[in-house]
């Protein structure tokens, strides 16, 4: 379980950053490319 906790935190942070990026950016394509 200890190995999964950091991964979950990283995923949560990435999701939050992605949402902020969408709200600030007018081009969702750039946000999708940043995730890839």
From Swiss-Prot:
This is Putative DNA-binding protein inhibitor ID-2B. It comes from Homo sapiens (Human).
């Amino acid at each position: 379980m200890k190995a999964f906790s950091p991964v979950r935190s990283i995923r949560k942070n990435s999701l939050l950053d992605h949402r902020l990026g969408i709200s600030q950016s007018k081009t969702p394509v750039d946000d999708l490319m940043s995730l890839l």
